[in-house]
């Protein structure tokens, strides 16, 4: 009788231990999936996007430099050669010290 109680207690303890190990592994898999999703956020090609954005600019070097800075901070460049800033609110919100729009 004493052996069966000890066997039952050790079996119960083993099951609880296995449950804890499984829950820890599930948490690790979930956190790894979240961190992989954060790293899978791809950087855009700022050079190509800014070249397209600044192709009609009268000062293309200045435009490309400003656009590149904005793209590096926001990881987006609005489509087209001007306007369309609603597609990239971060790009539209950056300003100079004089409160002028920084991004072309």
From Swiss-Prot:
Expression induction or repression: Locally up-regulated by abscisic acid, wounding and infection with compatible fungus. Down-regulated by gibberellic acid or infection with virulent bacteria. No responses to ethylene or abiotic stresses.
InterPro entries: GASA
GO biological process: defense response
Residues of the propeptide: 24-38
Signal peptide: 1-23
Primary location recorded for the protein, binned into one broad class: secreted
Gene Ontology cellular component terms for the protein in this record: extracellular region
Compartment annotation: Secreted, Cell wall
Keywords for the protein's UniProt record, in alphabetical order: Antimicrobial, Cell wall, Disulfide bond, Plant defense, Secreted, Signal
Tissue specificity of this protein: Expressed in tubers, stems, flowers, shoot apex and leaves, but not in roots or stolons.
Function, as annotated: Has an antimicrobial activity. Causes a rapid aggregation of both Gram-positive and Gram-negative bacteria, but the antimicrobial activity is not correlated with the capacity to aggregate bacteria.
Similarity field: Belongs to the GASA family.
Protein name, entry field: Snakin-2
Originating organism: Solanum tuberosum (Potato)
Source taxonomy: Eukaryota, Viridiplantae, Streptophyta, Embryophyta, Tracheophyta
Recorded name of the encoding gene: SN2
